[in-house]
Every structure is written in structure tokens, then in C-alpha cells.
């Protein structure tokens, strides 16, 4: 999949109606938006369209999982004033996203108008399947999906996608708008530029840091990374499955992934054949229970982990080893924490890795944080602007790193 796509800055927007797929899937509480980060992230793309003389901007998004029917708590209406506030301009909310009323409102609007459509996922056609209010499974026919996509297409002259977080989903709003120019917005463009830098043309040594719980969840990621990287750090819960298989280490009550265990030796053989250095933890912070007030002690591969105890973070020697590996890398992709960072007692390893990645960035390395938990760590320790790129899409970035095609990216016009 080529990651170089037509960008909004390559398109003449003057006098055009610009239809933008944004990601306004924001956290809500009691009908109020509790975090406006995703809205703020889309503002530069919206502002750019208006500054370049777009006749109108039509914003479409999903919110939550209403499963193909109207659910009031998932309405985008409360999001509208927040968009307006951040944009510094009035935004008109439309009570649906398709149908004659919406098409008429967007047909010939006053120049400079901005509209926000109601939640795309109130229609089963957006995702293709859903669940009815009474709990039965529902499914849209190909003709229904086509009609839904055509109705969305009528709302603009140019299509822009800025919803990287949904790019791995072949939903109607992501792949169905058949306008002559389908460009990426600034957010999507930044994601694609950084991932292309790492996956298509990395400066070496190229290091992947992989954490998280299960080997079996990350197997495609590990296999694809072995084709690309020079070094690989494996931390988090999945390290115990590796250590038990390779060193026959006693891991106590630590996470063990039986299906994942079957592929450990294959991974090690592939790494050897491809000349990839794999780095595993050599010591651990262990705990007698999964809690902040647990008793802890440091254990090694040799000593093993006592029965009833579990490894919840990497130990001081491992931190020292991993820091050396991180400091010599020129390109770093990080997906998954080193330990249970949500509890301060077991956050030391992840925090140390983060500090080292920040240092590497200062020294000129390109550092990319895959979405999900690792992005949460950046927010927790305020390092979002101290690394090259924090991905906004957990699932989408994981699929890119696994070497998969992203339907929402494939659907965009290629850069000339």
C-alpha cells in the first residue's frame, strides 16, 4: 500500500463544498464533552479549507457504538458548540447525515458555512451491520449501503478524510464517497508521512519496542517488524511467555499465553535468520498481588518468580540494558507498555523507556508512538510534544505496522 496520497494542500478549494470525515468520537459525560482533544486536532484542516475560500465545510463523524439506530446519548449535537468554540465560528448542526433535508441544506449554502452532521452510525449502512433496539442483529444490503454513500457524496464537491483512527474500517463514510478528488487532511497526512518514514525508508538502526499482554495478539506485528527492524525489544506481559519458552524460567503467576507460546521458537529462529537482535528482560519487579499496595521484590531469570507472585514491570538491570538499545537507534516505533504503568509502583520501566525515547528524539532519532496504551503514557507523562509522532489511531496504527492495507487510505486519491 502506497502511503503517499493527495493532500488537502494539493487541491483547489475555492468555491467548493468540502466534505470532511473527522473523528469526533470524544468522551462524554451527562451530555457534555469531557475531552476536546480530537476536536482540536481537526481544527487546522477545517480552518485551512475556509481560509482557502471553500464555499462550505460539511463535517461528518461517528460517536460511540449506537449499532445502526438512533440512540440519544450518542448524538453529536452537544459536540457542535465545542467545534464552534474552537473554530471561532458558528457551526450549524443538522439532525441527520443523509436524506433530502440534509442534501437541501448543503446544496447551495451561504459562503463560509460550516455544518456538522448527526452521528453516521445512527444508520446501519455506515458500518454495514448493527443491532436493533430490541437486540436482534441487523444488516444493510449492498444497495442500501450504495444509496447511503451516494447521499453523503451529494453533500460536497471535494472529499477530505482526517479520521486516521477509523482508517482500518471499510465503512461507508471512509470508502464510499465517490467524488473526483479524495484527499487526506493534515492529521491523516501527518500519520501517513511518519509511518511511511518508518516502514518504507527508515534511518537505521531501526528499533521496535513491543509490549502488551499477549504474544498471540501481536504475532502479525512481530512477524512484520522482523522483516524491517535491526533490533526488537520485547517487554510487558508477553515477555514472560518468551522467557518461559526460551529459558524454561519459572514465572509464578505471571501472564502466560499458551497459544502464543507455540510460536516463540519460530520467532527466535526468524530473528536469527534475518539478523535481528531480540532483547528480553533480565530482571523483574514482582508482586504478591495485582494491586498498588502489593509487596514487591526484584527477581531474575535465574531465580525465577515465586509461586503466587507475578511480574508486573521490568527491573533495574533491564532498564539499563534497554536504555542502551534505545539510545543507539535512529528510528523507533513503540507499541505497548513495559509494565502495568497504570499503577505507580509498576510504572518505572515504562517511564524509563519513555525518558530514553525522548532523549533519542532530542538526538535526532525519528520516534513514533503507536496509539492505545503507549499514547496514554505520553499523555500521562506529558511527552506528546517530546517525541516525533504520537499516533491518534490505536487499531489503525497497529494494522499499518502489521503490514495490512487500510481501506480508508486505499480509498484516497494517490499523490501525483
Swiss-Prot record:
Cofactor(s) essential for the protein: Mg(2+)
Pfam families from the UniProt entry: PGK
Tissues and organs where the protein is expressed, per its UniProt entry: Expressed in all cells of the worm (at protein level), higher expression in the cells associated with the tubercles (tegumental modifications), the muscle and along the tegument.
The reaction(s) this protein catalyses: (2R)-3-phosphoglycerate + ATP = (2R)-3-phospho-glyceroyl phosphate + ADP
Binding positions for Mg(2+) per the UniProt entry: 213, 217, 373
Record EC number: 2.7.2.3
UniProt pathway: Carbohydrate degradation; glycolysis; pyruvate from D-glyceraldehyde 3-phosphate: step 2/5
GO biological process: gluconeogenesis; glycolytic process
Residues where (2R)-3-phosphoglycerate binds: 22-25, 37-38, 61-62, 64-65, 120-121, 168-169
Cross-referenced PROSITE patterns: PGLYCERATE_KINASE (PS00111)
Annotated CDP binding sites: 212, 217, 236, 336, 341
Key words, A-Z: ATP-binding, Glycolysis, Kinase, Magnesium, Metal-binding, Nucleotide-binding, Transferase
Subunit structure: Monomer.
Family that this chain belongs to: Belongs to the phosphoglycerate kinase family.
The protein, known as: Phosphoglycerate kinase
Amino acid at each position: 500500500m502506497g502511503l503517499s496520497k493527495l493532500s488537502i494542500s494539493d487541491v483547489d478549494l475555492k468555491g467548493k463544498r468540502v466534505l470532511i470525515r473527522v473523528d469526533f468520537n470524544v468522551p462524554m459525560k451527562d451530555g457534555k464533552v469531557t475531552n476536546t482533544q480530537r476536536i482540536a486536532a481537526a481544527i487546522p484542516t477545517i480552518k485551512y479549507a475556509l481560509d482557502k475560500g471553500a464555499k462550505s465545510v460539511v463535517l461528518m463523524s461517528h460517536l460511540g457504538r449506537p449499532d445502526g439506530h438512533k440512540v440519544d446519548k450518542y448524538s453529536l449535537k452537544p459536540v457542535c458548540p465545542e467545534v464552534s468554540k474552537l473554530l471561532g465560528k458558528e457551526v450549524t448542526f443538522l439532525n441527520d447525515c443523509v436524506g433530502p433535508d440534509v442534501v437541501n441544506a448543503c446544496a447551495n449554502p451561504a459562503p463560509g458555512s460550516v455544518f456538522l452532521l448527526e452521528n453516521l452510525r445512527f444508520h446501519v449502512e455506515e458500518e454495514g451491520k448493527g443491532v436493533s433496539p430490541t437486540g436482534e442483529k441487523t444488516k444493510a444490503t449492498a444497495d442500501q449501503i450504495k444509496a447511503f454513500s451516494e447521499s453523503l457524496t451529494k453533500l460536497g464537491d471535494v472529499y477530505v478524510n482526517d479520521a486516521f483512527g477509523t482508517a482500518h474500517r471499510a465503512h461507508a463514510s471512509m470508502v464510499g464517497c465517490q467524488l473526483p478528488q479524495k484527499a487526506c487532511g493534515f492529521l491523516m497526512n501527518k500519520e501517513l508521512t511518519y509511518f511511511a518514514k518508518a516502514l518504507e525508508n527508515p534511518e537505521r538502526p531501526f528499533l521496535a519496542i513491543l509490549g502488551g499482554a499477549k504474544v498471540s495478539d501481536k504475532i502479525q506485528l512481530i512477524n512484520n517488524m522482523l522483516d524491517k527492524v535491526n533490533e526488537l525489544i520485547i517487554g510487558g506481559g508477553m515477555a514472560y511467555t518468551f522467557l518461559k519458552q526460551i529459558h524454561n524460567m519459572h514465572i509464578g503467576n505471571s501472564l502466560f499465553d499458551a497459544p502464543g507460546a507455540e510460536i516463540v521458537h519460530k520467532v527466535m529462529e526468524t530473528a536469527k535468520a534475518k539478523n535481528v537482535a531480540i532483547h528480553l528482560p533480565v530482571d523483574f519487579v514482582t508482586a504478591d498481588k495485582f494491586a498498588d499496595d502489593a509487596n514487591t521484590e526484584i527477581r531474575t531469570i535465574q531465580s525465577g518468580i515465586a509461586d503466587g507472585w507475578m511480574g508486573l514491570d521490568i527491573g533495574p538491570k533491564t532498564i539499563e540494558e534497554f536504555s542502551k538499545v534505545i539510545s543507539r537507534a535512529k528510528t523507533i516505533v513503540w507499541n505497548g507498555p513495559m509494565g502495568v504503568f497504570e499503577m505507580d509502583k509498576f510504572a518505572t520501566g515504562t517511564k524509563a523507556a519513555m525518558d530514553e525515547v525522548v532523549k533519542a528524539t532530542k538526538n535526532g532519532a525519528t520516534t513514533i508512538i503507536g496509539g492505545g496504551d503507549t499514547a496514554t503514557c505520553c499523555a500521562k507523562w506529558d511527552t506528546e510534544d517530546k517525541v516525533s509522532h504520537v499516533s491518534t489511531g490505536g487499531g489503525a496504527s497497529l494494522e499499518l505496522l502489521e503490514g495490512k492495507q487500510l481501506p480508508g487510505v486505499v480509498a484516497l486519491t494517490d499523490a501525483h
